[in-house]
């Protein structure tokens, strides 16, 4: 009985400790294929290494939220940090600017990462 109580106590303690972990997200913005003006492609925003799991990810075109953005299932690493992929179909042009905006409790303000076309 005492052993069972100790095991339950350790499990609860580990859950509480996990909730105390705070890690800011790492953000990468890239396309599925090399970009060509006027040719359909996919814009991806890969957000990783964050905790807790509550997060908001938006893809932006010229500063405005894009429609039809899909999210992968929330997944986690061995260290309990989380990762998520937001993506949408888009047709790049030379004049349009694309970015990913991430809102998370570890950030004082949303993190905006611009898509660097030449990367």
Curated annotation (Swiss-Prot):
Matching Pfam families: C1-set
Disulfide bridges in this chain: 45-100
One GO cellular component, as annotated: Golgi apparatus
SMART domains hit by this protein: IGc1 (SM00407)
SUPFAM superfamilies on file: Immunoglobulin (SSF48726)
Domain of life: Eukaryota
Signal peptide: 1-20
Keywords: Disulfide bond, Immunity, Immunoglobulin domain, MHC I, Secreted, Signal
CDD domains: IgC1_beta2m
InterPro entries the UniProt entry points to: B2Microglobulin, Ig-like_dom, Ig-like_dom_sf, Ig-like_fold, Ig/MHC_CS, Ig_C1-set, MHC/Immunoglobulin
A GO BP annotation: regulation of erythrocyte differentiation
Subcellular location field: Secreted
GO molecular function: protein homodimerization activity; structural molecule activity
Ranges of residues in domain Ig-like C1-type: 25-114
Subunit annotation: Heterodimer of an alpha chain and a beta chain. Beta-2-microglobulin is the beta-chain of major histocompatibility complex class I molecules.
Task performed by this protein: Component of the class I major histocompatibility complex (MHC). Involved in the presentation of peptide antigens to the immune system.
Family designation: Belongs to the beta-2-microglobulin family.
Protein name stated in the entry: Beta-2-microglobulin
Native source species: Cricetulus griseus
Gene: B2M
């Amino acid at each position: 009985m005492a052993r069972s109580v100790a095991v339950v106590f350790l499990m609860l303690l580990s859950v509480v400790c996990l909730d105390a972990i705070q890690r800011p997200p790492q953000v990468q913005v890239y396309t599925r294929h090399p970009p060509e003006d006027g040719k359909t492609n996919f814009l991806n925003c890969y957000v990783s290494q964050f905790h807790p799991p509550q997060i908001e990810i938006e893809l932006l075109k010229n500063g405005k939220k894009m429609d039809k953005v899909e999210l992968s299932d929330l997944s986690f690493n061995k260290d309990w940090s989380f990762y998520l992929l937001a993506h949408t179909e888009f047709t790049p042009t030379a004049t349009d600017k694309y970015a990913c905006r991430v809102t998370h409790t570890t950030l004082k303000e949303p993190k905006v990462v611009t898509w660097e076309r030449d990367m």
